[in-house]
A protein has these predicted regions:
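Metal-cofactor-binding active-site regions of metalloenzymes
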Residues: 2-249, 253-385
Length: 385
């Protein structure tokens, strides 16, 4: 799947999206993957960050997530330390959020991008009018978590405040054309001390900052599977501290073989998410072992699934377009709601329009399924109103 598609592909999507659906809601986008590579290069140069890359060309090759340098979730995530360092600090977070929102509004409905992620389509099919951004504020403090330090160069309180101010400024600039808010991610690759600090910060700031929509659990599943009941209980406590009953809950779980079906089920029951990202293990267990417990749990609790097509294929969570079609049909079979998002559009040189065209071109989704997913996103968003 490439960022540049044929005119026929563009026509397919344009025919499917009716005039009244030209403003879409996107639920699953990471801030670290939403700033175009050429802008990250400029930010790194401006901040004098050492060792970003030997050249601009090397930088693009390093950060661009493709089939040549990915292969599984761990490899997919390995360059995010560089991005988080470039985005460290209140001003860098503000700049990143403004760029991400501008990009979503301008290029989300485009079918062609330039080599650095700049928009290249003069006639976008739609705009993104509501966008949920997720990131980990602790990873924007400038700290190297591999050294086990719980705090960094920058104040996390100022980072959270700066993010919320940037969101409000963007909405004013667009005159209501785009609305946004944040999911703050606990890290599977962070210590319990750091994750607890984040939980307490969210609990404090959610009282005054309406742009804080919810919490998430993200990062490499290999680093923390939560198969240990004691660890799962700890994470559930952090979700309760941060989200309580007034914030949305979503969780990355079941994307890789590191998490089996039993752990997937236990995680859903303990963390009580409203939405779940990439729950591939639930479908694969049904296909391979005829074990429908995961799918039945998602249906029973009316949990919405966040599907990110290109990243799921890059990490080998889903093999190809044909298997993606099977995945979607399986969710429909069990009456499970789902939405489509880009995950890290800038790093994959993709757009939401590009992802949807890919599905249509390969007959992995029908127009009816696509329109239903649009409506589901509008209903499932944590952005109120």
């Amino acid at each position: 799947m490439t960022a540049e598609n044929t005119t026929t592909g563009a026509t397919l999507l344009r025919q499917v999206v009716p005039p009244e659906k030209r403003e879409l809601t996107e639920l699953h986008v990471h801030l670290g993957g939403s700033v175009p590579i050429y802008r990250l290069w400029e930010m790194g140069i401006a901040r004098g960050i050492r060792g970003v890359a030997h050249s601009y060309e090397d930088f693009i090759r390093l950060l661009h997530r493709s089939s040549e340098n990915t292969g599984d979730l761990d490899h997919y995530l390995e360059i995010f330390d560089i991005i988080e360092l470039i985005q460290a600090g209140p001003s860098a977070v503000q700049e990143s959020i403004l760029i991400a929102l501008n990009g979503a509004y301008r290029t989300g409905g485009m079918t062609r991008l330039g080599p650095g992620g700049e928009g290249g389509d003069p006639e976008p099919i739609f705009t993104i009018s509501r966008l949920e951004l997720r990131f980990n504020p602790m990873k924007r403090t400038g700290v190297l978590f591999s050294r086990g330090e719980p705090s960094g160069l920058f104040d996390v309180d100022r980072i959270i405040r700066a993010a919320c101010e940037a969101a409000e400024e963007s909405e004013i600039a667009y005159r209501g054309g785009i609305r946004t808010g944040f999911l703050f991610c606990f890290g599977r690759d962070m210590s319990w001390e750091v994750n607890r600090t984040l939980a307490e910060k969210v609990r404090y700031w959610k009282k005054s900052q309406k742009k804080i929509l919810g919490v998430d659990l993200a990062g490499p599943e290999s680093a923390m599977t939560l198969s240990n009941p004691a660890e799962l209980e700890q994470m559930a406590e952090l979700f309760d501290i941060a989200a309580g009953d007034d914030l949305g809950r979503t969780v990355h779980v079941g994307e890789t073989p590191h998490v089996n079906l039993d752990t997937f089920i236990a995680t859903i029951k303990a963390l009580k998410p409203h939405r779940v990202a990439h729950p591939v293990v639930a479908a694969r267990s049904f296909w391979e072992q005829n074990d429908a417990r995961g799918l039945e749990l998602l249906a029973e609790r009316d949990i919405c699934c966040e599907l990110c097509v290109k990243s799921n294929i890059l990490t080998k969570a889903i093999a190809d377009a044909a298997e993606y079609g099977r995945f979607i049909r399986t969710l429909d079979e069990f009456g499970i709601r789902y939405t489509f998002s880009t995950d890290s559009p800038a790093l994959q040189l993709t757009t939401l329009a590009n992802e949807l065209e890919f599905l249509l071109q390969h007959a992995a989704v029908t127009p009816e399924q696509l329109l239903r997913a649009f409506s589901t996103a509008e209903q499932a968003t944590f952005i109120k109103g």
